[in-house]
């Protein structure tokens, strides 16, 4: 079974290497980089064009893109797994505040350069539980430019995208929202998304993990992906 793995902001496809290494050969796990230079909807569509008919697994920003793809192209998405992701920001004022915050980050990246920006980004409390040796800092530096980072902030950020909460009831299963138990915000979001989609959706919580579940606990992430494939093929 084909599985397409989509990384989050500042990450490259290489972020999925620890998970892919733990998946069996019968799962054709393909990690892709997020295209740049396109709008949010067009980026999601481009991921589907590259990935084809598959189970899609997205982390954070990559998860928001995969959700958009699943809603727009249910014929392409055989199953959807979202790690530490949301459907966007429903409240207009909160969304505007997020756009302002992301614009500030973009200006900082343009002013300070990629190395300083990535160092600050990974020092956020959001990544407090992410071991430095699992962060993949060198891959992030090699796989990004200031232009790609600022485009992602200004065009692909949660403040820029159309919120998808109202479309969740249209999402066709299987759908699996995942969050680390130490990431309380996204635990709540996982349960809220599940409730919107329907009674057959049950979130998975990864014990002892924070926001970057796939980096902090690749073994548990691979195990839940193996289970998804088993459920689809049994």
Annotated model-derived regions:
Residues 58-62, 66:
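Gly/Ala-rich beta-loop-alpha elbow adjacent to hydrolase catalytic centers
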Residues 93, 108-167:
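Conserved alpha/beta-hydrolase catalytic His-Asp/Glu region
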Residues 71, 78-110:
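Flexible "cap/lid" loop of the alpha/beta hydrolase fold
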Residues 1-38:
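Conserved HGGG/HGGXW glycine-rich cap/lid loop of the alpha/beta-hydrolase fold
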């Amino acid at each position: 079974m084909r599985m397409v793995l989509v990384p989050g902001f500042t990450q490259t496809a290489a972020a999925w290497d620890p998970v892919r290494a733990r998946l069996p050969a019968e799962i054709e796990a393909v990690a892709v980089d997020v295209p740049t230079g396109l709008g949010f909807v067009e980026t999601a569509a481009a991921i589907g064009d590259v990935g084809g008919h598959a189970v899609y697994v997205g982390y954070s920003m990559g998860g928001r893109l995969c959700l958009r793809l699943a809603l727009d192209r249910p014929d392409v998405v055989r199953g959807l797994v979202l790690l530490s992701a949301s459907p966007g920001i429903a409240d207009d004022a909160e969304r505007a505040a997020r756009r302002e915050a992301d614009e500030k980050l973009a200006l900082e990246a343009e002013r300070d350069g990629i190395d300083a920006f990535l160092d600050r980004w990974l020092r956020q409390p959001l990544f407090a539980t992410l071991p430095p040796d699992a962060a993949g800092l060198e891959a992030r530096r090699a796989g990004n430019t200031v232009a790609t980072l600022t485009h992602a902030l200004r065009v692909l950020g949660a403040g820029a995208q159309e919120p998808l909460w109202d479309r969740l009831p249209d999402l066709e299963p299987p759908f699996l929202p995942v969050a680390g138990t130490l990431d309380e915000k996204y635990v709540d979001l996982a349960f809220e998304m599940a409730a919107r989609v329907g009674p057959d959706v049950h979130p998975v919580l990864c014990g002892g993990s924070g926001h970057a579940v796939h980096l902090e606990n690749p073994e548990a992430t691979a195990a839940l992906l193996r289970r998804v494939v088993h459920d689809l093929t049994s």
